[in-house]
Amino acid sequence: IYYVLNSSPRYEPIYYQHRLAVLINNQHMPYQYYARPAAVRPHVQIPQWQVLPNIYPSTVVRHPRPHPSFIAIPPKXLQEKTVIPKINTIATVEPTPIPTPEPTVNNAVIPDASSEFIIASTPETTTVPVTSPVV
C-alpha cells in the first residue's frame, strides 16, 4: 500500500510498474529489473543483416519518360476534308431459307374415282391416300 500511494500522485491503483522503454542491448541500461547476462563483453559486434546486391528485378515496370525537348510534335497542317462514306458495320442478318420438303402424294387407284383426281408421282414404296381437309 505504501508503494502504491507514493508512486501514484493521483492515488490510483497501478498494477504494473511504469518503466521507460529502453533497448535491451543498451550498454548504459541498469540491470535492476533484468537478469544480468553471464558474460558481459562490451565490444562484441552485434550481428547485422548483410546488405545484399539487388539481383532480383523490381516488380514495378518503370517506363522511361523522355524529356519534353525530345518529343516531336508535328505542326498542324490544313487538310481538305475528305468525305468518308459511311459503312454500315453492323451487317443485317438475313435468315437463310430452309427448303421444306413437300410430302409426295401417291394415290392408290380407287375404282370409284375419276382419272382427273389421281396424281401419279415418282415411284415410291409407300402410298398415301389424299383426304380433303375438314373445316
Curated annotation (Swiss-Prot):
Pfam families in alphabetical order: Casein_kappa
Residues bearing the modification Phosphoserine: 114, 132
Keyword Transmembrane: no
Positions annotated with a glycan in the UniProt record: 96, 114, 131
InterPro entries from the UniProt entry: Casein_kappa
Alphabetized UniProt keyword annotations: Glycoprotein, Milk protein, Phosphoprotein, Secreted
Subcellular location: Secreted
Gene Ontology biological process: lactation; protein stabilization
Tissue expression profile of the protein: Mammary gland specific. Secreted in milk.
Residues the record marks as site: Cleavage: 70-71
Any Gene Ontology CC annotation: extracellular space
Protein family membership: Belongs to the kappa-casein family.
Role summary: Kappa-casein stabilizes micelle formation, preventing casein precipitation in milk.
Protein name: Kappa-casein
Organism of derivation: Equus grevyi (Grevy's zebra)
